[in-house]
């Protein structure tokens, strides 16, 4: 008579949150974590540069608090938290988000379903925490990009992402030497994990709320210096031009179209017929991005969508500019060592 095998235990979750001057948003993050229906094995908070400007976690949360004397960036902070963790799954999320009551349960269930799943990540929800236009636009765009992305993902996102502990340490964690400030340390780690043949899943139903307030400068600074420039160098280093998320074919063509638009408008000052090229480029941009504009119209209405378009086109312009600068920098200064 064959004995019934005992059901396997669900993987233990270690929550790891890096925080730098977290303020009120971090308090909301902690409140949401305390309200979770499923409790993780442990909660590890890494205060990058100390607790100045960061609320003290309530003792009832039972969190392990690590502090660094000097800020070294989120990559190093997450690595420190991972070294302290003892769970099977390292669940990273940012200090300016709130998880849902069932978020931890969903993460646990995904890893319990497949032993071959190395990592997963989710997305922001469609109800950003801050009500100003740019915060709504920026966070809704992020939500849209992840919601149309491929579930069989080629990268990783630490804003709401989980990795098996053994996989994380197999690859040495986040590259804190290359990324000592907020950048694309999560994307770079995802590239390494995927290149080795591991499975990463984009779980579109695992959604968190982003509380960050976005303004004009914070958007351009983040997109240009912390994402587009280092991402360009990463793409060129790995020779990895993916057709997914922010680097899909429509986005690449949109970059070409926006530069065609700008150059033809400049040429029209001396040669007015160039305006026909400008009109064609504008039409092409609209057609290429019709789905995202339909998404914004459905979520926030026509007037909101009209205000989105110039910001979205500006995004393509400075992303293309960053690619050009990154290409030159890589060509002349990159050291393969």
Question: Locations of the language-model features?
Answer:
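Short, acidic, metal-binding catalytic loop of nucleotide-sugar glycosyltransferases
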Residues: 31-40
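Glycine-rich, basic loop-to-helix element that forms the pyrophosphate-binding segment
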Residues: 68-85, 106, 157-158
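Short aromatic/hydrophobic "clamp" motif used to bind/position activated sugar donors
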Residues: 90
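Conserved donor NDP-sugar-binding/catalytic core segment of glycosyltransferases
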Residues: 102-134, 211
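Short, flexible, basic/aromatic active-site loop/helix in glycosyltransferases
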Residues: 119-124, 136-155
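Catalytic donor/gating beta->alpha subdomain of glycosyltransferases that bind UDP-sugars
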Residues: 175, 180-243
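Basic/Trp-rich segment in TM-proximal cytosolic loops or flexible interdomain/linker regions
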Residues: 212, 217-274, 297-306, 336-337
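Membrane-embedded multi-pass helical conduit in multi-pass membrane proteins
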Residues: 256-329
């Amino acid at each position: 008579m064959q004995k019934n095998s005992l059901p396997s235990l669900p993987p233990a979750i270690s929550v790891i949150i890096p925080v730098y001057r977290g303020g009120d948003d971090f308090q909301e993050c902690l409140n949401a974590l305390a309200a979770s229906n499923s409790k993780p094995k442990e909660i590890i908070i890494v205060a990058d540069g100390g607790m100045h400007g960061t609320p003290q976690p309530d003792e009832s949360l039972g969190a392990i608090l690590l502090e660094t004397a000097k800020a070294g960036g989120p990559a190093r902070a997450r690595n420190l938290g991972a070294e302290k963790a003892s769970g099977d799954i390292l669940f990273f999320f940012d200090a300016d988000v709130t998880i849902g009551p069932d978020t931890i349960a969903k993460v646990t269930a995904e890893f319990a379903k497949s032993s071959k799943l190395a990592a997963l990540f989710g997305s922001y929800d469609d109800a950003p925490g801050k009500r100003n236009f740019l915060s709504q636009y920026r966070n809704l765009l992020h939500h849209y990009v992840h919601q149309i992305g491929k579930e069989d993902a080629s990268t990783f996102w630490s804003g709401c992402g989980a990795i098996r502990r053994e996989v994380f340490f197999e690859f040495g964690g986040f590259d804190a030497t290359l990324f000592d400030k907020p950048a694309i340390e999560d994307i770079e780690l995802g590239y390494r994990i995927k290149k080795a043949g591991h499975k990463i899943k984009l779980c579109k139903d695992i959604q968190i709320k982003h509380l960050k307030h976005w303004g004009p400068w914070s958007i351009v600074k983040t997109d240009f210096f912390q994402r587009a420039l280092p991402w360009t160098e990463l793409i060129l280093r790995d020779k990895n031009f993916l057709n997914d998320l922010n680097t899909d074919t429509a986005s690449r063509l949109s970059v070409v179209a926006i530069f065609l638009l700008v150059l033809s408008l400049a040429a029209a000052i001396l040669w007015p017929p160039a305006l026909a090229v400008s009109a064609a480029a504008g039409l092409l941009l609209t057609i290429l991005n019709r789905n995202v504009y339909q998404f914004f119209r459905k979520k926030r209405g026509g007037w909101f969508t009209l205000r989105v378009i110039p910001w979205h086109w500006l995004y393509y312009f400075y992303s293309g500019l960053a690619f050009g600068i990154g290409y030159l920098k890589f060509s002349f200064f990159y050291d393969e060592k």
